[in-house]
Amino acid sequence: MRFFYKLALMTTVASLACSDTALASTDLMPFNVAETQVSTHDIVSAGRSLRAEDTSTSIDNLRDPTMKEKIQFKLWYTRGKTPGQVHRDFFEGLDESIIVNNPNYEVWKMYEAYYNNKKGND
């Protein structure tokens, strides 16, 4: 009886070990989508979209901050960081054309709006 249990246990362990290696070596095929005129162009206007960059820094054009950004803004505000200090931390020594295209520029503009809103409420 004892031999039967050892044999069953060894068989189970061996089959689990083999199935893990078989699963690890399985490669998934990438899913590619062909670019067609329907998928890449506007059907209604059948025209090309404009590629002009919108570099306006209006507060109305800002997206809503994510939860992580809201927490970061609150942390900066409680530590007494002004938008100027945050701007210096992010962009010190960078050219203005590089700054405008930097993803942190939008975060800085949102913090500036947050800071001005908090200062206005105080």
From Swiss-Prot:
Signal sequence, renumbered to the chain: 1-24
A GO term from the CC aspect: host cell cytoplasm
Entry keyword Nucleus: no
Induction: Expression is up-regulated in spores.
Location relative to the cell: Secreted; Host cytoplasm; Host nucleus
Keywords on record: Host cytoplasm, Host nucleus, Secreted, Signal, Virulence
Keyword Transmembrane: no
Motif RxLR mapped to chain: 48-51
Main location: secreted
Notes on the domains: Has the canonical translocation RxLR motif, but lacks the canonical EER motif, which characterizes most oomycete effectors identified so far.
Family: Belongs to the RxLR effector family.
Cited function: Secreted effector that does not suppress pattern-triggered immunity (PTI) in plant host.
Protein name: Secreted RxLR effector protein RXLR-C251
Species this protein is from: Plasmopara halstedii
Phylogenetic classification of the source organism: Eukaryota, Sar, Stramenopiles, Oomycota, Peronosporales
Name of the encoding gene: RXLR-C25
